[in-house]
């Protein structure tokens, strides 16, 4: 905008570079669903998914989406309402049971997204579980893990996300495949 890109002390407005040399996630296995689209287009996929194509909506794995989203599982994100423009339009979409039939939110706070959920599953807070914290998004080339032992016991009925998903896998008959013999 001010023609300063590339001059000393300036940049493009993007965040500084970072490299993610440590992958702290669990293996994901093979996903039988091959079709995907950018997450921030989920409202369009709820209302009119069939109009979303590889050319106009970056659909991958197919030329277009074949059906509207009817079920949303939102984990620790609060992305249903506060990460998008047009909050009033999103509210109407989320409140219409004919559009999204079921919304599940997993979080440790009653976020704006959780207020639209049919089911809220209580997650733990970082201080209640042993964790390995990985590289943050803005620390440059310093790849590391920090051991974070729990500082407090889990209160009430919260469960770590791994345990929530283990229970779901158990109910679908794939618990052993999900856990691969591991426990949390």
Where do the PLM segments sit?
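Short, solvent-exposed turn/loop segments enriched in Gly/Ser/Thr/Pro and often Arg
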Residues: 4
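Non-catalytic alpha/beta scaffold blocks inside enzyme catalytic domains
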Residues: 1, 9-184
